Amino acid sequence: MALSTSSIGKKFIQGISGAFLIVFLLLHATINFFSVIDSFTGKYGAVAVDDKLFSMGDGLFKLGCDFMSTPFISIMVPILALGFLVHIFYGGWLSWRNMKARGGFKRYEVASKAAADSWSAKNMLILGIVILGFICFHLTHFWAKMQLPEMFGIGTYEDNPYVLLNAVFAKWWVLVLYVVWFGALFLHLTHGFWSMFQTVGWSGQIWMKRLKVIGVIVAAIICLAFVAVAVNAFLQANALI
């Protein structure tokens, strides 16, 4: 009970839920990046228009999507949803508490002047709201077309992920919105990565500098992979490659 009611406990839960979501993002980015690899092998365009090739399971991205349909992942979906809800709830609560304590719209509590000077550290709440809004936008494009019909029989099911990628990213303005979202995600992750280690007590000056660098690298890998997927799908959908 103390873990969920005390200030330190809430920060700990926020950090752990954040770590869980980072692992998910790494897996999600990796599987989606398979579609970019398929472009270089010539399988993306072929599988996107040939149902026979698609049914044969050709393409790394198709294999990755098949993995995401396994019973293990089906069990993990509600756990993932819970992780998001916990992270959103405690993130909002901590931000509200900080604003109330400081008497104004003050952002995340940070441990040092250097951290306080970071734009992302000061604007974690705003970044979180932007990311949450785009998650809802993103779910209408993919989850609502694949998992939702499969799990609940709602909507039209699209079983070819290549076709779905093309349909979503064919419009340039959708691509731009997603790139903006990935930028917000990058800023959120660069601060969130090292702060989750600080939350669990790993806050030595030497290691904190290293963790900030590692955080930038991890955030860059995740977000650049997503950007590559979106740009590649736009180029494929418009027959530019």
Enumerate the predicted regions with their spans:
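Membrane-embedded alpha-helical bundles that constitute the cytochrome b-like, heme-associated redox core
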Residues: M1-I241
